[in-house]
Amino acid sequence: MYPVALKKYFLSIMLALVSSGVSAEIFLFSSGNQFHGCLDCEESDQNSICNRYGKFGSLYQSSSIWNANGIGNVGRRDSPFSDMGIGLKMADTQGNFKGNLSISDKGDTEYSQLLKVIWGANQENYSDVRNDFCTLIEKLNNKKI
């Protein structure tokens, strides 16, 4: 694992790289159009993937991307953490497709690139990945106008 100082430096670089392409309220859906939370909602939002006490941010809820035995399982085709899968569909509030959230080559968004790097940097530890990813999301939310 990276030393803490290097990790913080790395995360600040990643934040700078993606802060220009951030949009508001991106929702995640599996291939069957099952809802899996809001990617960039405020942490306190009950639908936020960063609300660790909510249905979509908990390590223990099967609908949470952070659950290794649920939608986050690396063996699932629609898991964001599958090397070979398509990940979850991303859509805005109008239902417009915004790409896939995936660490695989199908992950064609800045969010996917962030997730892929954080996934590797945290040695695939779901709790640490959630914490780092959500820290960046919070910082990105604070930059919105």
Q: At which residue positions do the language-model features occur?
A:
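Bacterial N-terminal signal peptides that target proteins for export
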Residues: 2-10
